[in-house]
């Protein structure tokens, strides 16, 4: 599914479910150390290249993503819905002008 389609679906869910007090958001994770990315990130040159184009200059950890998801599931985020949360550590952000 493309990013645009996922955002459209997230916003549609937010509108449909909001009347029931249910929020819907999407989280973009970038390169995070998981079983799925292990084969790519085990190549030192690739991992370095990813770090070099990430503002935080490191790869993501599962707990980085978990904290965002836990926040979105908490009462503190009850007014956030229909959003695309970029939890990538600033992956491929354009340099400052």
What is the role of each PLM region?
Residues 3, 66:
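Conserved catalytic core of two-component sensor histidine kinases
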Residues 23-33, 73, 86-88:
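Conserved SDR Rossmann-fold cofactor-binding beta-strand/turn motif
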Residues 70, 81-97:
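Short C-terminal tail/terminal secondary-structure segment
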Residues 2, 10:
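Active-site helix of classical SDR
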Residues 7, 29-39:
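Short, flexible catalytic-loop segment of classical short-chain dehydrogenase/reductase
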Residues 15-19, 78:
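Alpha-helical segment proximal to the catalytic Tyr-Lys
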Residues 39-54:
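A short C-terminal helix-loop "cap" of Rossmann-like NAD(P)-dependent dehydrogenase/epimerase domains
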Residues 54-65, 76:
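A conserved structural motif in NAD(P)-dependent oxidoreductases
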